[in-house]
Amino acid sequence: MLSKKFGLSMIVLGIMSSSAFADSIVEGRTLNVAVSPASPPMLFKSADGKLQGIDLELFSSYCQSRHCKLNITEYAWDGMLGAVASGQADVAFSGISITDKRKKVIDFSEPYYINSFYLVSMANHKITLNNLNELNKYSIGYPRGMAYSDLIKNDLEPKGYYSLSKVKLYPTYNETMADLKNGNLDLAFIEEPVYFTFKNKKKMPIESRYVFKNVDQLGIAFKKGSPVRDDFNLWLKEQGPQKISGIVDSWMK
């Protein structure tokens, strides 16, 4: 059985050798990549300013196997998505959620991670959510452009649990978590990998108050109609669930 972190059960690919794809699709090419490195451990910067993370390791490994190069450009989150949607970039990755809205302008790889959304507070801010009706008592924030807005708009708002107009939006998770720490925000929406990074690696005293389990999938984004997407899916299949999960798990520790 595939682990929840490797959602490749629905891959359906035509029979085509990896060498045929490599020779005709990406071998010798330089792929333009758009990133927004503010979603650890999917993509972020080390203390010395170097890009690192799950997404970079995955796509660099793919490119190494296919003998291509990466030309990486940093953007704000919306700019990153706009770059790949417009064709300015061939690829985008930074822990990008696969959504129906985005699929209208972007092609996605098969998901490599089945994601959960956490509502977190500072540990000393004793918030108990017995049910979602209590959400309206609290301020909620998260980085702009994230898939949490879809969850609120399509699920929480119609049920009267929370209004999208009440959400506080921030440039990145860093600003979101800073406001949470400073007491200017009650709850932050934060995805599972980022939650464990802040809690376990950055030692931020936060606690989960509610979990929306397995509501999200992360994938690599490609410009519409790109054959590179199909080759990347083939590469994922070649690696197998165990190897991909091993890469993901190594960044979660």
From Swiss-Prot:
Coiled-coil regions, chain positions: none
Entry function: Part of the ABC transporter complex dalSTUV, that imports D-alanine into the cytoplasm. Helps protect the organism from oxidative killing by host neutrophils through sequestration of D-alanine, a substrate that is converted to hydrogen peroxide by the host enzyme DAO (D-amino acid oxidase). DalS shuttles D-alanine from the periplasm to the DalTUV complex situated in the inner membrane and through hydrolysis of ATP, D-alanine is transported across the membrane into the cytoplasm. Not required for the metabolism of D-alanine found in the stem peptide of peptidoglycan.
The protein's name: ABC transporter D-alanine-binding periplasmic protein
Upregulation: Expression is increased when grown in low magnesium minimal medium with an acidic pH, in a manner dependent on response regulator SsrB.
Entry's family note: Belongs to the bacterial solute-binding protein 3 family.
Pfam family, one: SBP_bac_3
Localization: Periplasm
Disruption phenotype: Does not affect growth in vitro but leads to decreased growth rate in macrophages. Decreases survival in host neutrophils. Decreases virulence in a mouse infection model.
Transmembrane segments: none
Quaternary state and interactors: Monomer.
Keyword terms of this UniProt record: Amino-acid transport, Periplasm, Signal, Transport, Virulence
GO MF entry, a single one: amino acid binding
Major localisation: periplasm
GO biological process, one term: D-alanine transmembrane transport
One cellular-component annotation, GO: outer membrane-bounded periplasmic space
Keyword Signal attributed: yes
Signal peptide segment: 1-22
Effect of substituting M146A: Additionally binds alanine, arginine, glutamine, leucine, lysine, and phenylalanine
Name of encoding gene: dalS
